[in-house]
């Protein structure tokens, strides 16, 4: 077997980078695998904050597994092929560690697969360290903590599992940080949107979902001021229309999430706005609507869209 590439999803967030980096370390230590952690995109500002804080270099970015000489891959923080590497159907998936729905995915051979309904893939990787009696280095503990904080908005998201609270406390101790203090600093680092172009903003954290024959792009940006983001609405809509035309998305749903008050504004464009309105039981006005208490794409947006689209 050639070298195994380990990576998270496209447009990697902190959990994608953290879980893949940590699993790469674990794979070498516990399973004696010849792995290399890579990424399917550059780290965002939140992730860059975590990497810098714990003195870790960002994984190198790749676009094709076969171009790297890899015939086998390990996926973390995703399993759906549209969210993975460009040639995912041309290589063998050796393993998966994820905490999302399982969809748009199949393999020719059996594989290692660990999927749990917890707050982050990082939570699962930490559990694997403990199960295999591998000590967690300080930098890796810090990254795993960062992945958990990011995906659960500092344990406030409804995706937070009861076990995640204990995991966060243990990882914070191993990383030598104060959970609340470090967590808020990291999250705020990811809300600096002023320097982003509209095209960059809608691609910071975006995933494509195949819903009943429709390619639906669901993106999320975190902020401390929704109104400030909506001041750029016209330019954001222009960027959305451009990417829909170039990539063939039927619909685009952007979550603008207030990390302080735990609410979101939904900005949506596309061919199936009736289904979007049905999904969230609201009426879009000028292409947007307020969604109280919504902070999780995984739990509060994608399942509702999936049901409404009849996928």
From Swiss-Prot:
Among PANTHER family, the record links this protein to:
BIFUNCTIONAL OLIGORIBONUCLEASE AND PAP PHOSPHATASE NRNA
Q: What is this protein called?
A: Probable manganese-dependent inorganic pyrophosphatase
Q: Does the keyword Transmembrane helix apply?
A: no
Q: Quote the record's binding site residues for Mn(2+) 1.
A: 9, 13, 77
Q: Which residues bind Mn(2+) 2?
A: 15, 77, 99, 151
- In the UniProt record, the gene name given for this protein reads ppaC
Q: Where is the major localization of this protein?
A: cytoplasm
Q: How is the cofactor bound?
A: Binds 2 manganese ions per subunit.
Q: Which organism is it from?
A: Streptococcus equi subsp. zooepidemicus (strain MGCS10565)
Which keywords accompany this UniProt record? Answer: Cytoplasm, Hydrolase, Manganese, Metal-binding
Query: Which reactions does this protein catalyse?
Result: diphosphate + H2O = 2 phosphate + H(+)
